[in-house]
Design a protein with these regions (language model features):
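Short amphipathic beta-strand/extended segments with alternating polar/hydrophobic composition
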Residues: 62-65, 99-103, 142-144
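Short acidic-glycine-tyrosine-enriched beta hairpin
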Residues: 93-110
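Short, charged beta-turn/beta-strand-edge "cap" motif at the junction between a beta-strand
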Residues: 112-116
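Basic/polar N-terminal segments that are highly enriched at the extreme N-terminus
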Residues: 1-9
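Glycine- and acidic-residue-biased ligand/ion/polar-headgroup-sensing regions
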Residues: 44-60, 69-95
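Short hydrophobic-aromatic micro-motifs
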Residues: 50-52, 106-108, 128-131
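Intrinsically disordered, low-complexity, positively charged segments
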Residues: 8-67
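Surface-exposed beta-loop interaction hotspot
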Residues: 117-162
Length: 162
């Protein structure tokens, strides 16, 4: 298991208007989120947001605190939304197991000490995309399945990103 992160600094809005495609991609595009048995993150100076991806293949991946958080564990002062965009898997948070299918979401509130990601089938691994922000209050963890989700389909399938 490997945890990687990079820090992205905010761009001056006036300067950003003059950026070419290469510079825009360098400053804003996040690539390589899903690498087998890695947790990859970008810590952004925009609202101290963390965007990341975890793709467990045959082993459990731990969501570790990264240096910019200056915290003993990842959710010490943060909350996180986790979305499965791959095969079936599950997330464990402080002993509670949340099975997650494709397009299902999990909210974990501030304070969960140990969070791990696992895939049900290494041949079709789960891909957990997550966004985390600072939290100033604690709310209960909650799994939203596809059956429970409020769905709104707009446009046509050919011209959308369903």
């Amino acid at each position: 298991m490997k945890t990687n992160f990079e820090i992205r600094y905010a761009s001056n809005p006036i300067d950003a208007k003059s950026y070419d495609t290469a510079r825009l991609r360098k400053d804003f595009l996040i690539e390589k989120l899903f690498v087998a048995n890695e947790v990859n993150m970008v810590y952004s100076m925009y609202d101290r947001m963390v965007v990341g991806g975890a793709m467990p293949v045959g082993e459990s991946l731990l969501l570790e605190a990264i240096d910019p958080l200056k915290a003993p564990y990842f959710l010490t002062r943060r909350e996180i939304g986790i979305f499965n965009v791959g095969g079936k898997g599950f997330v464990k948070a402080d002993g509670e197991t949340y099975p997650m299918d494709y397009k299902e979401a999990l909210y974990l509130g501030r304070g969960d000490r140990k969070v791990t990601f696992e895939s049900l089938d290494p041949e079709h691994p789960a891909k957990f995309y997550f966004c985390s922000s600072p939290a100033h209050a604690t709310y209960p963890d909650h799994l939203t399945t596809r059956d429970e989700a409020v769905k709104m389909e707009l446009g046509t399938l050919e011209e959308s990103n369903h």
